[in-house]
Amino acid sequence: MEIGELRPLKEMAVKPGSVFRMRFYPQDGIVPKDSSDTSRDKYFIILGKDNKGGYVALSLINTAINENLRQRIGAFQYQISSSDYEFLNGKDRFVDCYDMKEVASERIIEQGDYAGLISETDLKAIIKLVNDSPIVSVAKLKRYEIYYVD
């Protein structure tokens, strides 16, 4: 039996550092790969939860850095190694720390597939980059209790 099939375990897994895979749509701010597609499956890392637990803040995991945006967002992309994480399927990827998405916890529990857990070292580095991002507001960081502690 997998964790994705067990709601109570999945609820416990919705916490900072957990990685899930879920389908996103244009209304989520995610552009499908092909013009004929209406959605896109993405891996993401949970960074924090609001104090009521109804929403989480997350960073998306991308296969590559968008070349059209590299100059603006490149410094806020954190590379994670496939040798450290089985769910990466043998390919290093990038965590987008330039921006973070806000998603209902219930949606992740209902639709997300648990993939794994990011190491404390990687999570700390990701949180630092998110805190340094010029577009993530202090109010949003406070709402989700995403603080970088050296």
Give names to the regions the model predicted.
Residues 25-29:
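Short, charged beta-turn/beta-strand-edge "cap" motif at the junction between a beta-strand
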Residues 30-41, 46-84:
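Compact nucleic-acid interaction/catalytic patches
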